[in-house]
Amino acid sequence: MSWLEKILTKSNIVSSRKVSIPEGVWTKCTSCEQVLYHADLERNLEVCPKCDHHMRMKARRRLETFLDTDSQVELAADLEPKDMLKFRDSKKYKDRISAAQKSSGEKDALIVMKGTLLEQPIVACAFEFSFMGGSMGSVVGAKFVRAVNEALESNCALVCFSASGGARMQEALMSLMQMAKTSAALQRLSAKGLPFISVLTDPTMGGVSASLAMLGDINIGEPKALIGFAGQRVIEQTVREKLPEGFQRSEFLLEHGAIDMIVNRREMRQRIGGLVAKMTNHSSPLVVPIEQPKLEESAPEQTPEQE
């Protein structure tokens, strides 16, 4: 055997064959582009451990991690959208519904559950953005009203996680009507003195932001969430002015008083649990008391003699 054959033995040759990696094992952060192990990302509630970027979260997963384990009961799960107007744009509406149901695994863009949060009774709902952009149609409106009615019957708080592009254009006037319908339902909740906490996630736009999403007794934003009515480019073309950078992000809205607070997703359970306990006068051993902000003491006024 020659010296070359000794070097090129099978044990010394590295295979150039590509190793196949199962799909869904790794995920790239959409902000810092760091490659992340998907199982670790799920345990971290879809928050990047490198840059703290809050990625979009599936509605069902959000509710399952928000409510206490073994307390979750889904409501109005049988409701499905119908193409009552026989609407067609580049594609039939009924075909869009079928495609959205297949890709998202949900019947429509809102999921409603009742359960407990830190042993406190609560009704929670979440928008599924992957279902036609989380758009609000007649079924979404009906499910939200069902959530309000359940909160009224159970005498408990209501929490909604919004992630929507707005009203569903394929349902025309019927989708616009849901803005008034959901707002009227929340008025009944308010009249009974029950709290509604609205959590605005990325993105919350259009008819949803113009109705139920901004009607919370407390409006909470996730970090860097896009929140507004129309997009920045549309507004700039209308007013013919350059708008401030990030003017539709939750940090800008908090600074200008449009929302009440920004809460990290990993702290959401404890923070909302504390707020609900405070607003409903409910005591639970699992709730960490909310500390009152300390007021800055003003300097004593100087007398003419001291000056």
Swiss-Prot record:
Pathway(s): Lipid metabolism; malonyl-CoA biosynthesis; malonyl-CoA from acetyl-CoA: step 1/1
GO molecular function: acetyl-CoA carboxylase activity; ATP binding; carboxyl- or carbamoyltransferase activity; zinc ion binding
Keyword Acyltransferase: no
Native organism: Photobacterium profundum (strain SS9)
Catalytic activity from the UniProt record: N(6)-carboxybiotinyl-L-lysyl-[protein] + acetyl-CoA = N(6)-biotinyl-L-lysyl-[protein] + malonyl-CoA
The record's free-text note on cofactor binding: Binds 1 zinc ion per subunit.
Keywords assigned: ATP-binding, Cytoplasm, Fatty acid biosynthesis, Fatty acid metabolism, Lipid biosynthesis, Lipid metabolism, Metal-binding, Nucleotide-binding, Transferase, Zinc, Zinc-finger
Zinc finger boundaries on the chain: C4-type: 29-51
Name of the molecule in the record: Acetyl-coenzyme A carboxylase carboxyl transferase subunit beta
Lineage per the UniProt record: Bacteria, Pseudomonadati, Pseudomonadota, Gammaproteobacteria, Vibrionales
